[in-house]
Amino acid sequence: MYLPWGVVLAGGANGFGAGAYQTGTICEVSTQIAVRLPDEIVAFIDDEVRGQHARSRAAVVLRALERERRRRLAERDAEILATNTSATGDLDTLAGHCARTALDID
């Protein structure tokens, strides 16, 4: 989600630059990190921003990480389906597994 830059509340509890970006009633807490990237990746990120495909470098990195997270979750779901369904396609075993599995919801 893209939020317009708002008020930055400096200093986080962990002392590593965590702050809250606030616009109206929407408040999103984030932590700033530094990473080293190859020049060609940085050039791609800058092209994305310059071409208005993203609002900032951080938005490009966030989009890529969210996509990777969704891919891994889908991969996990596929493994669960593969191990918990019978050859006949009966989903009773899978339904039982789902009923016993705690949801990872924030």
From Swiss-Prot:
Superkingdom: Bacteria
GO biological process: detoxification; negative regulation of growth
Triggers of expression: Mildly induced (about 4-fold) when grown in a non-replicating state.
Cysteines joined through disulfide linkages: none
Keywords on record: Toxin-antitoxin system
GO molecular function: toxin sequestering activity
The keyword Glycosyltransferase belongs to this UniProt entry's keyword annotation: no
Annotated function: Antitoxin component of a type II toxin-antitoxin (TA) system. Upon expression in E.coli and M.smegmatis neutralizes the effect of cognate toxin MazF3. Overexpression of MazE3 alone decreased persister cells formation in M.smegmatis upon challenge with gentamicin or kanamycin.
Subunit text: Forms a complex with cognate toxin MazF3, possibly with 1:1 stoichiometry.
Entry protein name: Antitoxin MazE3
Lineage, opening ranks: Bacteria, Bacillati, Actinomycetota, Actinomycetes, Mycobacteriales
